[in-house]
Amino acid sequence: MPNIVLFSGSSHQDLSQKVAERLGLELGKVVTKKFSNQETSVEIGESVRGEDVYIIQSGCGEINDNLMELLIMINACKIASSSRVTAVIPCFPYARQDKKDKSRAPISAKLVANMLSVAGADHIITMDLHASQIQGFFDIPVDNLYAEPAVLQWIRENIPEWKNSSIVSPDAGGAKRVTSIADRLNVEFALIHKERKKANEVDRMVLVGDVKDRVAILVDDMADTCGTVCHAADKLLSAGATKVYAILTHGIFSGPAISRINNAAFEAVVVTNTIPQDEKMKQCSKIQVIDISMILAEAIRRTHNGESVSYLFSHVPL
């Protein structure tokens, strides 16, 4: 593809390499390092004048360092006269800080949006935003891609009894996502209502819907400490579910997450590779990964060629 340059930040080079291979491109030359005082240094190693630049950097690992690195890379390309800079952020950082949920709380997702725009980003490509309204925090175009087509494909290919299943949301916020998947599969859906007392602590859970003698498939946009999904799995089994799967777009798996999954009664915990999972998979045999590099690659190709991206909302590209 002419006039396109693809760069990778240091957060998820494996995913960037897969995207580059699917596009038939070499990753652009960039050197990122730290100065002795821990400031981030970025050197773009090739001309980007007049080029359509895409920078892949996920919000994971050392999130603040990686965000700063992304901002510097965007700015470096912008002031080097690139024609357009697109930030490809598979897992958007600070997405859970999207509203004032208590007095004096910051809306950090809006701050990140402002920072990306000020750095010089002309366009954002991301996946399964925690709240889709975050798109409205930007004054530049945002394409929020969905893992749903890849999730549907995985369910059909890997769960033999999927026709006798219930798609379950572990909280009220995910009801829309779950009903969409249930409708596409033509199966039942259920919802777990939770009453939260403190952040990252789950209290009482109430199941709305029927899972008796069915395979329960928990679906959510992210799993962090996994307290919610593991409690939900216990609730579903006690309500008569025959098996429980969890399918989550962003597998953050921080703190006690891995030990909780190992001790929970999941058949499998399935995540996408918006975040690197190799180390986590070594610690937990239940974790399986859906590759979404083809969705990102196709979104980049369509954006570069000025084609519609909405096809990807309902199809998995080959």
Curated annotation (Swiss-Prot):
E.C. number: 2.7.6.1
Pathway in which this enzyme or protein is active: Metabolic intermediate biosynthesis; 5-phospho-alpha-D-ribose 1-diphosphate biosynthesis; 5-phospho-alpha-D-ribose 1-diphosphate from D-ribose 5-phosphate (route I): step 1/1
Binding site for ATP: 96-101, 130
Region (Binding of phosphoribosylpyrophosphate): 212-227
Catalysed reactions listed for this entry: D-ribose 5-phosphate + ATP = 5-phospho-alpha-D-ribose 1-diphosphate + AMP + H(+)
Alphabetized GO MF terms: ATP binding; kinase activity; magnesium ion binding; protein homodimerization activity; ribose phosphate diphosphokinase activity
Any one GO biological process: 5-phosphoribose 1-diphosphate biosynthetic process
Gene3D superfamilies in alphabetical order: 3.40.50.2020
Pfam families hit by this protein: Pribosyl_synth, Pribosyltran_N
UniProt keyword GTP-binding, yes or no: no
Matching InterPro entries: PRib_PP_synth_CS, Pribosyltran_N, PRibTrfase_dom, PRTase-like, Rib-P_diPkinase, Rib-P_diPkinase_bac
Enzyme class: transferase
Cofactor(s) it depends on: Mg(2+)
Binding site for Mg(2+): 128, 130, 139, 143
Mechanisms controlling activity: Activated by magnesium and inorganic phosphate. Competitively or non-competitively inhibited by ADP, 2,3-bisphosphoglyceride or GDP.
UniProt family annotation: Belongs to the ribose-phosphate pyrophosphokinase family.
Assembly description: Homodimer. The active form is probably a hexamer composed of 3 homodimers.
Name the UniProt record assigns to this protein: Ribose-phosphate pyrophosphokinase 2
Organism classification: Eukaryota, Metazoa, Chordata, Craniata, Vertebrata
Originating gene: prps2
